[in-house]
Structure formats: C-alpha cells, structure tokens
C-alpha cells in the first residue's frame, strides 16, 4: 500500500529575536513571570517588509534542499496558516510562484494551531489516493501582526516563523512497521469557538483584528484533548504509547506539553521542545520542531513519532508516523 514518508524538512525564523525582557517596560510583566507560566524565553518577529509567504518560501527552500529535490518535482503545495498575506489568493499559490513552479496545485488550510496536523492528514490522503506523489507542506505564521500589545495574557506567547516538510509516496506492507504516516485523528467542536479567536475579519469588521483567548479554559481543554487524540491515533495504528520514541507537540506552553506527556506516560526526554526559543508559532510550531530536531540528528530511521496540536475552533488532532 502507498504510504506518505518524510523526505525532507526545513525551517526559517526571522532575524529579530525578542527576549522576555522586551515586554517589561510595556506591560505589567517580567521575564520570570513569563517563564514560570509558559516556559517561553524568547521568540522571533518578522521584519516589517516580511509577509507570511516570504517565511514560507524560505522554509520550503530549506526543506527541498534537505530532500535533495527541485521544486519541479513537487506535485502539490499545502500551507497551513491563520495569517495570510491577503484574503486571496492563497499563500500556497504565492509560495508556488516564489519557488518557480508552473505546475501542480496549491491551497491553504486554516485550523489555527492545529493546522499542520490537518495538513499532514490532507497530504497523506492525497498520496494514498494517488493524486500526488510528492507534497510540500508548510506551516507559516506572522502572529505578531494580530497581537494586542496591551494584553499580557496573549502578546507574550506568540512568535513568527515557518517550517516545511516534504512528503513522498513509498510502498509499504500495510503494517505498523512501515515508514511514513500510519494513522491520523482529527477533531473539532465549534461550541468552543469563543475561547480562542481573532476579533476581526473581512465579513465582520473589515479589519484584521486582534487575538483573544480565555487562557485558563483553553489550557484545560488542551490537557484533556491532546492526550486523548494521541491515544486514538496510536490505537488506529495498532500501537501503544510505550512504543513511542518521540512526542512532537504543538509548542504552545511548557505546562501543557508536560501535562500531555504525563498523561501519555512519556518521559520528557522523549519530547521535542522548542517553545523556549520560538514561543507559540501556531501552525508553524510542529514543522519547526520537526525540522530543528531532524537537523540535530535526533530522529533515527524507524523511530515512532506522534505529533499533536490544538487550536482555535476548537480544532485538534494528531498524527502517528514512522521516520
């Protein structure tokens, strides 16, 4: 059976690094307060002339180089983002053009912080169905553009960046020993839409708006739902948490990550962590973490990975894949 295996990874982080201390003369906060509650120490902000597509193109180029492929060998581009350059056309078509591609298809996918997990499931389905042999997946965000800089409960959390993964079709035996994506689990529940949202939009206010969040409630849902979705995906793959080599979580908050790992009975030594250096980069966080860990040589062939995320909607999900 056809499997979607990881051929390459790449990422890009803007040059501007913002330490927690930057917020101290703007808000009633401190480096110690932010670290204690989130685990975040710094984050990157895009330059004024950088758009989400610019970040995505640079991450895509890095992933293609890691895969040893040219853009002409890619069949589809999927970009997960909540901060597009424009209402339309899609960021994906801008990346497609930026890479010099004149073929294939490209589209955006919006599931906020869960976006890259949804994108992985989309790409897996395309490859399994024979609609594409190679898919370039990108998570790219410029959340600094939608921050309310007077709200210390949100503006200290987020950063900008992009990560990319090249998935490629390969033949497997149809067993849990195969390389590639083995199972996915996607969920959403719109009754919780007011827990995490942006208070602007084309059809409502005609403005970009600012991010709003009921942090305590989001935290509770995240701790419950992330471990549950990971367990469901593992069960679908015929696997158990004790077989997991690496948990690659959405990098929202260290306390959420620790609680999820505890519920899965995984030691923190098996968890990929980038939240301290990147902050919450929404849909970019999982591909950023994958790329950083891959560049460090942490993943070995045959390693079993679980990626999970939750975001506005609420939308959440997980992917089980073998490296």
Swiss-Prot record:
Alphabetically, the GO molecular function entries are: 3-oxoacyl-[acyl-carrier-protein] synthase activity; beta-ketoacyl-acyl-carrier-protein synthase III activity
State where the protein is found. Answer: Cytoplasm
Which domain of life does the UniProt lineage start with?
A: Bacteria
InterPro entries from the entry?
ACP_syn_III_C, ACP_syn_III_N, FabH, Thiolase-like
Q: Which Gene3D superfamilies match?
A: 3.40.47.10
Query: Which Gene Ontology biological process is one annotated for this entry?
Result: secondary metabolite biosynthetic process
Any idea of its EC number? 2.3.1.180
Which biological pathway? Lipid metabolism; fatty acid biosynthesis
What the entry lists under SUPFAM superfamilies is as follows:
Thiolase-like
* Catalytic activity, as annotated: malonyl-[ACP] + acetyl-CoA + H(+) = 3-oxobutanoyl-[ACP] + CO2 + CoA
Note down the stretches annotated as region ACP-binding.
251-255
Pfam families membership: ACP_syn_III, ACP_syn_III_C
Q: Which residues does the entry assign to the active site, renumbered to this chain?
A: 113, 250, 280
Listed GO CC annotations = cytoplasm
- Coiled-coil residue windows: none
Q: Which UniProt keywords apply?
A: Acyltransferase, Cytoplasm, Fatty acid biosynthesis, Fatty acid metabolism, Lipid biosynthesis, Lipid metabolism, Multifunctional enzyme, Transferase
**Subunit structure, per the record?**
Homodimer.
Q: What does this protein do?
A: Catalyzes the condensation reaction of fatty acid synthesis by the addition to an acyl acceptor of two carbons from malonyl-ACP. Catalyzes the first condensation reaction which initiates fatty acid synthesis and may therefore play a role in governing the total rate of fatty acid production. Possesses both acetoacetyl-ACP synthase and acetyl transacylase activities. Its substrate specificity determines the biosynthesis of branched-chain and/or straight-chain of fatty acids.
NCBIfam families with a match to the protein in the record: fabH, PRK09352.1
The Swiss-Prot or TrEMBL record describes its family as follows: Belongs to the thiolase-like superfamily. FabH family.
Comment field on protein domains: The last Arg residue of the ACP-binding site is essential for the weak association between ACP/AcpP and FabH.
Descriptive protein name = Beta-ketoacyl-[acyl-carrier-protein] synthase III
Query: What is the organism of origin for this protein?
Result: Paracoccus denitrificans (strain Pd 1222)
